[in-house]
Amino acid sequence: MAIVSSVPLASKSCLHKSLISSIHKLKPFCRTIPTLGMSRPGKSVMPSMSMSSPVSDDGVQRRTGGYHSNLWNDDIIQFLSTPYGEPAYRERGERLIDEVKNMFNSISMEDVEFSPLNDLIQRLWIVDSVERLGIDRHFKNEIKSTLDYVYSYWTQKGIGCGIESVVPDLNSTALGLRTLRLHGYPVSAEVLKHFQNQNGQFACSPSETEGEMRSIVNLYRASLIAFPGEKVMEEAEIFSTKYLKEALQKIPVSSLSREIGDVLEQDWHTNLPRLEARNYIDVFGQDTKDTKLYMKTEKLLELAKLEFNIFQSLQKTELDSLLRWWKDSGFHHITFSRHLHVEYYTLASCIAFEPQHSRFRLGFAKACHVITILDDMYDVFGTIDELELFTAQIKRWDPSATDCLPKYMKRMYMILYDMVNEMSREAETAQGRDTLNYARQAWEDFIDSYMQEAKWIATGYLPTFDEYFENGKVSSGHRVAALQPILTMDIPFPHDILKEVDFPSKLNDLASAILRLRGDTRCYKADRARGEEASCISCYMKDNPGATEEDALSHINAVINDVIKGLNWELLNPNSSVPISSKKHVFDVSRALHYGYKYRDGYSVSNIETKSLVMRTLLESVPF
């Protein structure tokens, strides 16, 4: 339990000044922010964790993590038996795609549903709908044309419902701000000021009509895509959060109330697109009374359901391949660690569910699973002498280097060796160049940082915050979780682009920082009970004598909010020379890994929310 104290919060100037000063600038950061990434997927928050040191089969005293057993076995494949791989379903899907394209292309003033007084909001509605339903990949050209049209009418005061609307409209402007910003259009959040009164409150009536509530929903969604220094976005988030939470207490249970609940739950930086699509399918269009609009929502909904279920037939094939890799690699002999390959595959499927990204999904699942095993090996199971030997032999990158290693390390060495080499061959096919040495260096740096932390544990040394933070940038695992999987995609990453998304780019730094900071807030108590004293919390308290755990947590949570805005800027900066499409997958890796810490340490306690995610997005089909 955090210690409650009346000691004032330590000044932000006491800690990583460059981070704080940079975060509050709207423009791109001028200084490199010291970062820390993911508190390696899986540090436990289970208070019942065993910290004993049993004698292992080799007679060595070893610590244990006390993790629960693997939740999934080969029987999971049986749950993925689905008829939706049949050609008839795919053919129906193709027909629906054509019909939805016609919906985009038929938007004109000749359509009686559209007029110069509502055409802008109608166009935005269609784009927003296909994106939230997870079917937007089929309509890239149509979305681009639609948003170009909307942007051509964008003003400093926002937009109205239609091109001839006299007064700007909050719903249209908020939805337009969010959607245009996410697609790289240079739109300023200052437009929202025109909807505030003198007290900073956003214009709304006390009646709380459905239309007004939907306006505030879109205001809230827009506020999450804030850049550093945008005070109006902070005000919009505070106002809309309060408004929607109060509205939920008053309105009856309906698809609107469920949508509001889902939106409040779906934090932008832990939002998984496939999970969002699954949830939105349940509420989309249910309250539609207009006949023609109902027909449109029905087509969109049917396509979304088909797409969701058809993808599961591909997931069955991929998961079967992953389970064979796990078994053939001998992971079942590694009993000291967590086994989360199914969970990591689920996360990968939630951020990249386009069929062509199979290598990314499998590569991400494998890399993250190996990271987890290495984490437990360095933090808990290995002796300091064994770990130093393993670290040195990794640099040789030669199977003969395993001759001097303990049996369990021989297996891990060859698993890592084979995995990195395999993904390098896949990356060479995709990128047209050899990236093995690049990947090897990333893994060597990562393992060196683990070794540093193992030494801290062995000696009981508590580093300064900056010392801990610098090493943690590498030990986060974010870089090695993202690097090789994205290189296997059919997206070109020439050297000049790669250096803007990989280490030492700000995008990589900030993505790592948010995971380290959030991970430490979820895991520090269990880590400390296990003998791992160093964390963002303990190092902050060391640097700021008199600060309590509550002070440290409050400060770190504030920093996390600022880092999120910086990460938004790095992804969406309209003046960047790097396309959003090239940066998005690194950003999405951050979202996926961050999701594991949304409620607790979901990598060690994976039998609650993480298990639910597997069930809802991987194993359960959408009913028709």
From Swiss-Prot:
GO terms for molecular function: lyase activity; magnesium ion binding; terpene synthase activity. Mg(2+) 1 binds at residues 375, 379. The gene is TPS-Phel-4. It comes from the Eukaryota. Binds 3 Mg(2+) or Mn(2+) ions per subunit. Pathway: Terpene metabolism; oleoresin biosynthesis. It is found in: Plastid, Chloroplast. Residues 44-56 have a biased composition (Low complexity). It comes from Picea sitchensis (Sitka spruce). This is (-)-beta-phellandrene synthase 4, chloroplastic. GO terms for cellular component: chloroplast.
